[in-house]
Amino acid sequence: MNLTLQSLILVSSLALVQGCAALGTSNSFTLTADLPPDFAYVASVYYVPAKGQACTVPRADNLAPQFNREWRTEYKPDAQIEIRRTRKGCELVVDRVELEINAIYGPDWSDFGREYAQVSVRAELPEAVKATFDAAGESEFSGQCQWLFRTIGPNRYITKILDCKKTDASGELLKSRPFAAYTLDELPGKTVKMKIKLANEERPYMKDTWVKVPGGWKRCMGKGFEDQYAFCYGNHKDFSTFRMPGGRICTIYPGCTEDKEVTR
């Protein structure tokens, strides 16, 4: 075997070994999300001293990295999350990823709702709590969000509140927010996906303020337009107009098909 061929074999072998070593010692995992249209997440990653470390790091030297901070204009669904890092000589490990779920519902800057989800990371976890990965190295946790609507102000502008709950493997809603937990040793090189669905129907934020009718809901008048709560109290005949995001005046939400003059 000539020298050139031996050199090629040696270089190829070293590259293969280095590649495998790098794969086995990955110091990050991929966080991604499958979200409804007009949804985006912001991720903040928090680190704590590794188990056995006696050191502490001032907050100013251990700031939480953020992904998708400019979620309206520069949103990217994939984020590479560092698992271990060193600050001031102290070995740190990821403790949790706090997730803001933002969703736009209207044309104005303030026409958006926000909810929260979380990925927790521990050195050890009970098997019943620890999320698992499939053969492709992917793990998914799911949730469902629903819009809750109400009116604010004397003109009764529609505003919405985003309510998100975790769903189990069968799609049933749970009481907690979307959440998943992993151990440090199972994360390197893996992918964690947050999958969120949007409920087909919206519902009133407060009970006894709207009446269900064909095409949607009618807003109870209460004591008048200045009555911010305007509970129905059994009066299902006197209703008010309200203003949709964007200013349209309507009598039925969300199936508004006509403009109405405001009557006081």
Where does each model-flagged region fall?
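Structured domain cores in non-transmembrane regions
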Residues: 42-166
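Hydrophobic helical h-region of N-terminal Sec-dependent signal peptides
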Residues: 9-14
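Bacterial N-terminal signal peptides that target proteins for export
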Residues: 1-8
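Structural motif
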Residues: 29-40
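A eukaryote-biased signal for long
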Residues: 124-264
